[in-house]
Amino acid sequence: MIEIESKFKLSSNITCDNLIAILKSQFVAPISSKHQIDTIFLLPEQVDAPIVPGSKIMRVRDTLDPETSKLRQSLMTLKVEGKAKLVSNEYESTVGDGNAARQILTALGWQEIVTVDKIRLESKTKDYTICIDEVAKLGLFIELEVLAEDDANAGDIQRQMHIFLKNLNIDGKLWTIPYDTSIRNLSIIN
Protein backbone atom coordinates (compact mmCIF):
# COMPACT_ATOMS: atom_id res chain seq x y z
CA MET A 1 0.00 0.00 0.00
CA ILE A 2 1.12 3.55 -0.69
CA GLU A 3 0.03 6.74 1.01
CA ILE A 4 -0.90 9.54 -1.38
CA GLU A 5 -1.28 13.08 -0.04
CA SER A 6 -2.15 16.57 -1.19
CA LYS A 7 -1.68 19.65 0.96
CA PHE A 8 -3.20 23.11 0.72
CA LYS A 9 -1.75 26.04 2.70
CA LEU A 10 -4.45 28.44 3.78
CA SER A 11 -4.08 32.19 3.71
CA SER A 12 -3.66 33.87 7.09
CA ASN A 13 -7.21 35.31 7.15
CA ILE A 14 -8.80 31.84 7.45
CA THR A 15 -9.21 30.31 10.90
CA CYS A 16 -9.61 26.70 11.87
CA ASP A 17 -13.25 27.36 12.84
CA ASN A 18 -13.93 28.94 9.41
CA LEU A 19 -12.45 25.89 7.76
CA ILE A 20 -14.51 23.42 9.80
CA ALA A 21 -17.67 25.35 8.91
CA ILE A 22 -16.79 25.08 5.20
CA LEU A 23 -15.91 21.38 5.34
CA LYS A 24 -18.43 20.06 7.87
CA SER A 25 -21.08 19.13 5.30
CA GLN A 26 -18.57 16.83 3.56
CA PHE A 27 -17.54 14.90 6.68
CA VAL A 28 -18.84 11.34 7.01
CA ALA A 29 -17.13 10.69 10.36
CA PRO A 30 -16.75 12.62 13.63
CA ILE A 31 -13.79 14.98 13.99
CA SER A 32 -10.96 13.71 16.17
CA SER A 33 -8.29 15.96 17.63
CA LYS A 34 -4.67 15.16 18.45
CA HIS A 35 -1.37 16.87 19.10
CA GLN A 36 1.39 15.20 17.07
CA ILE A 37 5.10 15.72 17.60
CA ASP A 38 7.17 14.11 14.85
CA THR A 39 10.93 13.66 15.13
CA ILE A 40 12.44 13.07 11.68
CA PHE A 41 15.66 11.12 11.06
CA LEU A 42 17.77 10.63 7.94
CA LEU A 43 20.74 8.40 7.20
CA PRO A 44 24.05 10.32 7.31
CA GLU A 45 24.51 10.13 3.53
CA GLN A 46 21.06 11.70 3.02
CA VAL A 47 21.45 14.68 5.35
CA ASP A 48 22.87 17.03 2.71
CA ALA A 49 21.25 15.39 -0.32
CA PRO A 50 17.81 16.04 -1.80
CA ILE A 51 15.03 13.59 -0.98
CA VAL A 52 14.56 11.49 -4.12
CA PRO A 53 12.51 8.40 -5.00
CA GLY A 54 13.78 5.57 -2.83
CA SER A 55 15.03 7.87 -0.05
CA LYS A 56 14.36 6.46 3.40
CA ILE A 57 13.03 8.65 6.21
CA MET A 58 12.40 7.51 9.78
CA ARG A 59 9.80 9.22 11.93
CA VAL A 60 9.01 8.81 15.61
CA ARG A 61 5.59 10.30 16.32
CA ASP A 62 4.30 11.03 19.80
CA THR A 63 0.54 11.59 19.77
CA LEU A 64 -0.73 13.58 22.73
CA ASP A 65 -4.17 14.50 23.99
CA PRO A 66 -4.50 18.18 22.95
CA GLU A 67 -6.34 19.06 26.17
CA THR A 68 -4.16 17.30 28.76
CA SER A 69 -0.88 16.77 26.84
CA LYS A 70 -0.99 13.16 28.05
CA LEU A 71 0.76 10.71 25.71
CA ARG A 72 -1.77 8.60 23.78
CA GLN A 73 0.72 6.57 21.75
CA SER A 74 4.10 6.57 20.03
CA LEU A 75 4.66 5.27 16.51
CA MET A 76 7.81 4.57 14.53
CA THR A 77 7.48 4.84 10.76
CA LEU A 78 9.82 4.12 7.87
CA LYS A 79 8.80 6.16 4.83
CA VAL A 80 10.24 5.23 1.44
CA GLU A 81 9.74 8.08 -0.99
CA GLY A 82 7.80 7.27 -4.12
CA LYS A 83 8.19 8.62 -7.64
CA ALA A 84 5.78 11.54 -7.09
CA LYS A 85 5.92 14.22 -4.40
CA LEU A 86 3.86 13.41 -1.30
CA VAL A 87 3.65 9.72 -2.25
CA SER A 88 5.40 7.09 -0.14
CA ASN A 89 5.40 3.52 1.08
CA GLU A 90 5.00 3.55 4.85
CA TYR A 91 5.89 0.83 7.33
CA GLU A 92 4.60 1.73 10.77
CA SER A 93 4.48 0.16 14.21
CA THR A 94 3.39 1.26 17.66
CA VAL A 95 6.31 1.57 20.08
CA GLY A 96 6.06 1.51 23.85
CA ASP A 97 8.52 4.35 24.40
CA GLY A 98 9.11 7.12 21.84
CA ASN A 99 12.26 8.31 23.62
CA ALA A 100 13.76 4.82 23.48
CA ALA A 101 12.87 4.60 19.76
CA ARG A 102 14.68 7.90 19.11
CA GLN A 103 17.73 6.65 21.05
CA ILE A 104 17.76 3.39 19.08
CA LEU A 105 17.68 5.25 15.75
CA THR A 106 20.53 7.50 16.88
CA ALA A 107 22.54 4.46 18.03
CA LEU A 108 21.97 2.89 14.60
CA GLY A 109 23.49 5.97 12.95
CA TRP A 110 20.35 7.82 11.88
CA GLN A 111 20.61 11.60 12.36
CA GLU A 112 17.83 13.65 13.91
CA ILE A 113 17.00 16.38 11.41
CA VAL A 114 13.86 18.27 12.40
CA THR A 115 10.83 18.21 14.67
CA VAL A 116 7.32 18.90 13.39
CA ASP A 117 4.79 20.02 16.01
CA LYS A 118 1.16 20.14 14.90
CA ILE A 119 -2.40 20.06 16.13
CA ARG A 120 -4.43 17.82 13.82
CA LEU A 121 -8.20 17.69 13.44
CA GLU A 122 -9.10 14.64 11.38
CA SER A 123 -12.24 13.32 9.73
CA LYS A 124 -13.23 11.55 6.55
CA THR A 125 -15.06 12.50 3.40
CA LYS A 126 -16.50 9.98 0.97
CA ASP A 127 -13.12 9.66 -0.76
CA TYR A 128 -10.40 10.91 1.60
CA THR A 129 -9.10 11.20 5.10
CA ILE A 130 -9.11 14.95 5.60
CA CYS A 131 -6.86 16.68 8.12
CA ILE A 132 -6.84 20.26 9.30
CA ASP A 133 -3.29 20.84 10.50
CA GLU A 134 -2.06 23.82 12.53
CA VAL A 135 1.69 23.38 12.05
CA ALA A 136 4.08 25.33 14.27
CA LYS A 137 6.28 27.67 12.16
CA LEU A 138 4.21 27.02 9.00
CA GLY A 139 0.54 27.83 9.61
CA LEU A 140 -2.82 26.26 8.77
CA PHE A 141 -3.19 23.50 6.16
CA ILE A 142 -5.72 21.07 4.74
CA GLU A 143 -4.19 17.69 4.02
CA LEU A 144 -5.97 14.97 2.07
CA GLU A 145 -4.73 11.40 2.41
CA VAL A 146 -5.64 8.11 0.80
CA LEU A 147 -4.14 4.64 1.00
CA ALA A 148 -3.95 2.96 -2.39
CA GLU A 149 -2.56 -0.17 -3.96
CA ASP A 150 1.10 0.01 -4.98
CA ASP A 151 0.17 0.09 -8.68
CA ALA A 152 -2.37 2.92 -8.33
CA ASN A 153 -1.86 5.98 -10.51
CA ALA A 154 -0.73 8.47 -7.85
CA GLY A 155 -0.72 11.36 -10.32
CA ASP A 156 -4.39 10.84 -11.21
CA ILE A 157 -5.35 10.53 -7.54
CA GLN A 158 -3.47 13.73 -6.67
CA ARG A 159 -5.15 15.55 -9.58
CA GLN A 160 -8.55 14.53 -8.17
CA MET A 161 -7.45 15.75 -4.74
CA HIS A 162 -6.37 19.09 -6.23
CA ILE A 163 -9.79 19.47 -7.88
CA PHE A 164 -11.49 18.74 -4.54
CA LEU A 165 -9.32 21.35 -2.80
CA LYS A 166 -9.82 24.01 -5.49
CA ASN A 167 -13.60 23.43 -5.43
CA LEU A 168 -13.65 24.48 -1.77
CA ASN A 169 -13.02 28.08 -2.96
CA ILE A 170 -10.72 28.84 -0.04
CA ASP A 171 -7.87 31.34 -0.25
CA GLY A 172 -4.51 29.62 -0.26
CA LYS A 173 -2.22 27.53 -2.45
CA LEU A 174 -1.29 23.94 -3.15
CA TRP A 175 1.72 22.90 -1.07
CA THR A 176 3.92 20.18 -2.55
CA ILE A 177 6.61 20.07 0.13
CA PRO A 178 6.27 17.86 3.23
CA TYR A 179 6.01 19.70 6.56
CA ASP A 180 9.38 18.38 7.76
CA THR A 181 11.19 19.60 4.64
CA SER A 182 9.40 22.97 4.82
CA ILE A 183 10.49 23.50 8.44
CA ARG A 184 14.02 22.31 7.67
CA ASN A 185 14.21 24.75 4.76
CA LEU A 186 13.18 27.59 7.10
CA SER A 187 16.09 26.80 9.43
CA ILE A 188 18.52 26.69 6.49
CA ILE A 189 17.31 30.10 5.25
CA ASN A 190 17.49 31.73 8.69
Task: Kindly give the residue locations of the regions a language model identified.
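Hydrophobic, well-ordered secondary-structure segments
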Residues: E3, F141, Q158-H162
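Residues forming anionic-ligand binding surfaces in small-molecule and nucleic-acid pockets
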Residues: T77-K79, K137-E145
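A short, sequence-level motif marking secondary-structure junctions
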Residues: T94-V95, V135-G139
